[in-house]
Swiss-Prot record:
Residues 1-30 form the signal peptide. Its main location: secreted. PROSITE patterns: MULTICOPPER_OXIDASE1, MULTICOPPER_OXIDASE2. Dimer. Cu cation 1 binds at residues 90, 478. It comes from Cucurbita maxima (Pumpkin). Cu cation 2 binds at residues 92, 134, 538. The lineage of its organism: Eukaryota, Viridiplantae, Streptophyta, Embryophyta, Tracheophyta. It is an enzyme of class 1 (oxidoreductase). Cu cation 3 binds at residues 136, 480, 536. This is L-ascorbate oxidase. Belongs to the multicopper oxidase family. The gene is AAO. It comes from the Eukaryota.
Length: 579
């Protein structure tokens, strides 16, 4: 059995790479169709011991976990039981090859599902990995519309690493203020910012105004929990001398997080559904939209329990860490660890954050990127003011989605459904990223970056100063419909001299990537998936304020689109004329 000790690390790597080679030889035989019937509705819940309204599925929060094997077809019958709101669900990390209408992005891939209506999502899960799903209309993710989506290897195949058990962890942040009040505040003049979350939730559970670790700090109020409450910690039950895989996904609306387990090193083996070169770390930073798998070995004192701690990074930590226990059975969960929880690194220690992120490279045998690209787009994200409203913009364009979904508008050639002028592909060379923007040319827009099928595209994400002096924030960017190679990161403005530093040897494949303050991030992808795809900051209020773009490729090759997906806006009339 695999041990976590350093002396066994080389043997583990050999097994890992051997297994990886076997994994790439998988077939699609024996795939299944997995059916789910979901009702989405608001309900009373107490995620952090304070009763509130959450958006749940079938009376559950978080929503039910989808578990399938690679090659399986997933069919979700989604019934909207919200009384006054539409709804969609995005299957984060699922590529939707052949089913771009099922991507679950309102105004891009489909119409919102109206109250009382039913919509069938039908798609194939291609690759094994750790994924999740969430609402993609307004700020419904912040309201609790999310859940886990786990894809195992095809039937009869195994992962390229051994483990004895598995723990699934979905991380989120929680506000006591309703999403409707948050949305109105973000769209007000002057803006009313949402503030930091009240609580970090681990599998939908957290504690507000009390701490399960109060015995180490007299300033904290101890939690008085029986264990059956919806806010009681989700305990990680483990047996001694075993290896466990912990799947970690972050569906936070705002918070960047740090995950650590007391006395237990983490072996990182997967990121965003792709295998990575394994490496040990004491903790991981995880940004909204990212997912990881880590292996731990329960080789510590078996008579003790150990802290699991999730703290905030990248923003001033006004939110207490989320806590739970790694419970070595048969110990009682009431037995607290002898030491306090791991201390979260300083929120503004970006060098530490970069050190972790830069260590992530592709596992041996992973697909390599094309040597050269056909097209390069530079995207500068800035915070701006438009007619007195605070917005986020990309190359001076703040995204406002049209009422007719792009997929249908382009499929039926509806030229007036959105701006036919493509957005800028570059920003001024003399732009000073170290000073606040001037806001002179910023506008609202909904144009599309269109690619030829097979085109190899580089995107350089460029960060800059916000409206307040000496302030730049972390932004995690998520691309729908594709995985991309992360070619590199850097400080300051990207220049031609940076070209030689790009990693073409073993860049990791991801679907979400971070851009650090005052820095740049370079990615490469192949436009080989016909459809229309969002590319946006995964921080919920930033997208709400316009921080995103739209990519399209080969829409003419998209097959039949279900009528209900396009029964709104200009496409509704087109469906009548072109049944």
């Amino acid at each position: 059995m695999l041990q976590m000790g350093k002396a066994r690390e080389p043997n583990f790597l050999i097994l890992f790479f051997f297994g990886l080679i076997l994994a790439f030889g998988i077939s699609s035989e024996g795939s299944q169709i997995r059916h789910y019937k979901w009702e989405v509705e608001y309900m009373f819940w107490a995620p952090d011991c304070n009763e509130n309204i959450v958006m749940g599925i079938n009376g559950q929060f978080p929503g039910p976990t989808i578990r399938a094997n690679a090659g399986d077809t997933v069919v979700v019958e989604l019934i909207n039981k919200l009384h006054t709101e539409g709804v969609v669900i995005h299957w984060h990390g699922i590529l939707q090859r052949g089913t771009p209408w099922a991507d679950g992005t309102a105004s891009i891939s489909q119409c919102a599902i109206n109250p009382g209506e039913t919509f069938f999502y039908n798609f194939t899960v291609d690759n094994p990995g750790t994924f999740f799903y969430h609402g993609h209309l307004g700020m419904q993710r912040s309201a609790g519309l999310y859940g886990s989506l786990i894809v195992d290897p095809p039937q009869g195949k195994k992962e390229p690493f051994h483990y004895d058990g598995e723990i699934n962890l979905l991380l989120s942040d929680w506000w006591h203020q309703s999403i409707h009040k948050q949305e109105v505040g973000l769209s007000s003049k002057p803006i009313r910012w949402i503030g930091e979350p009240q609580t970090i939730l681990l599998n939908g559970r957290g504690q507000f105004d009390c701490s399960i670790a109060a015995k180490y700090d007299s300033n904290l109020e101890p939690c008085k929990l029986k264990g059956s409450e919806p806010c009681a910690p989700y305990i990680f039950h483990v047996m001694p001398k075993k290896t466990y895989r912990i799947r970690i996904a972050s569906t936070t609306a705002l918070a960047a997080l740090n995950f650590a387990i007391g006395n237990h090193p983490l072996l990182v083996v997967e990121a965003d559904g792709n295998y990575v070169q394994p490496f040990y770390t004491s903790d991981i930073d995880i940004y909204s939209g990212e997912s990881y798998s880590v292996l731990i070995t329960t080789d510590q004192n078996p008579s003790e329990n150990y802290w699991v701690s999730v703290g905030t990074r990248g923003r001033h930590p006004n939110t207490p860490p989320g806590l739970t226990l790694l419970n070595y059975l048969p110990n009682s969960v009431s037995k607290l660890p002898t030491s306090p929880p791991p201390e979260t690194p300083a929120w503004d220690d970006f060098d530490r954050s970069k050190n972790f992120t830069y260590r992530i490279t592709a596992a041996m045998g992973s697909p390599k990127p094309p040597v050269k690209s056909n097209r390069r787009i530079f995207l500068l994200n800035t915070q701006n003011v438009i007619n007195g409203y605070v917005k986020w913009a990309i190359n001076d364009v703040s995204l406002a989605l049209p009422p007719t979904p792009y997929l249908g508008a382009m499929k039926f050639n509806l030229l007036h459904a959105f701006d036919q002028n493509p957005p800028p592909e570059v920003f001024p060379e003399d732009y000073d990223i170290d000073t606040p923007p001037t806001n002179e040319k910023t506008k609202i827009g909904n144009g599309v970056y269109q690619f030829k099928i097979g085109e190899i595209v580089d995107v350089i994400l460029q960060n800059a100063n916000m409206m307040k002096e000496n302030l730049s924030e972390i932004h995690p960017w998520h691309l729908h419909g594709h995985d991309f190679w992360v070619l590199g990161y850097g400080d300051g403005k990207f220049t031609a001299e940076e070209e030689s530093s790009l990693n073409l040897k073993n860049p990791p494949l991801r679907n979400t990537v971070v851009i650090f303050p005052y820095g740049w991030t370079a990615i490469r992808f192949v436009a080989d998936n016909p459809g229309v795809w969002a590319f946006h900051c995964h921080i919920e209020p930033h997208l709400h304020m316009g921080m995103g773009v739209v990519f399209a490729e080969g829409v003419e090759k998209v097959g039949r689109i279900p009528t209900k997906a396009l029964a709104c806006g200009g496409t509704a009339k087109s469906l009548i004329n072109n049944p």
